[in-house]
Swiss-Prot record:
Region annotated Mitochondrial targeting sequence, chain positions: 68-117
Keywords: Activation of host NF-kappa-B by virus, Activator, Apoptosis, Host cytoplasm, Host G2/M cell cycle arrest by virus, Host mitochondrion, Host nucleus, Host-virus interaction, Modulation of host cell cycle by virus, Transcription, Transcription regulation
Swiss-Prot/TrEMBL GO biological process terms: DNA-templated transcription; symbiont-mediated activation of host NF-kappaB cascade; symbiont-mediated arrest of host cell cycle during G2/M transition; viral genome replication
SUBUNIT field: May form homodimer. May interact with host CEBPA, CFLAR, CREB1, DDB1, E4F1, HBXIP, HSPD1/HSP60, NFKBIA, POLR2E and SMAD4. Interacts with host SMC5-SMC6 complex and induces its degradation. Interacts with host TRPC4AP; leading to prevent ubiquitination of TRPC4AP. Interacts with host PLSCR1; this interaction promotes ubiquitination and degradation of HBx and impairs HBx-mediated cell proliferation.
GO terms under cellular component: host cell mitochondrion; host cell nucleus
Main location (coarse class): host cell
Gene: X
Entry PTM: A fraction may be phosphorylated in insect cells and HepG2 cells, a human hepatoblastoma cell line. Phosphorylated in vitro by host protein kinase C or mitogen-activated protein kinase. N-acetylated in insect cells.
Protein name: Protein X
Function text: Multifunctional protein that plays a role in silencing host antiviral defenses and promoting viral transcription. Does not seem to be essential for HBV infection. May be directly involved in development of cirrhosis and liver cancer (hepatocellular carcinoma). Most of cytosolic activities involve modulation of cytosolic calcium. The effect on apoptosis is controversial depending on the cell types in which the studies have been conducted. May induce apoptosis by localizing in mitochondria and causing loss of mitochondrial membrane potential.
Length: 154
């Protein structure tokens, strides 16, 4: 079952989170890898915000109030863009986890909305895999030594 989610900035924690939208936010249970998950609050996001977004294979924590640990997706359409060509975005996100200024939250949120939620599929350990940290569960975050090539959750 595809989960309909949107990218939403949490200014209190300065992280980007995924919030369920559409049917899930209206109270229907969400089916996950560990069975049916409780529905999040309908006030998490406006019903029409990001309603065109659809992702498969979300981690269980994606449905928590804190948002997901990380999502592992790759995009054939965007993989060769300037942003991804030199692993710029993973470096940016790594700096953000360290509290360093690298990219404005507005620019980062716009990038996720424009690029990462279009034509993405979960591809396991594919060579061009990128793991984008969208907030929540920071203690599970692991990053390879600089230059940071990818993120993963422990």
């Amino acid at each position: 079952m595809a989960a309909r989610v949107c990218c939403q900035l949490d200014p209190a924690r300065d992280v980007l989170c995924l919030r369920p939208v559409g049917a899930e936010s209206r109270g229907r249970p969400v089916s996950g890898p560990f069975g049916t998950l409780p529905s999040p609050s309908s006030s998490a996001v406006p019903a029409d915000h990001g309603a065109h977004l659809s992702l498969r294979g979300l981690f269980v924590c994606a449905f928590s109030s804190a948002g997901p640990c990380a999502l592992r997706f790759t995009s054939a359409r965007r993989m060769e863009t300037t942003v991804n060509a030199h692993q710029v975005l993973p470096k940016v996100l790594h700096k953000r986890t360290l509290g360093l200024s690298a990219m404005s939250t507005t620019d980062l949120e716009a990038y996720f909305k424009d690029c990462l939620f279009k034509d993405w599929e979960e591809l396991g350990e594919e060579i061009r895999l990128k793991v984008f940290v969208l907030g929540g569960c920071r203690h599970k975050l692991v990053c390879s030594p600089a230059p940071c090539n990818f993120f993963t959750s422990a």
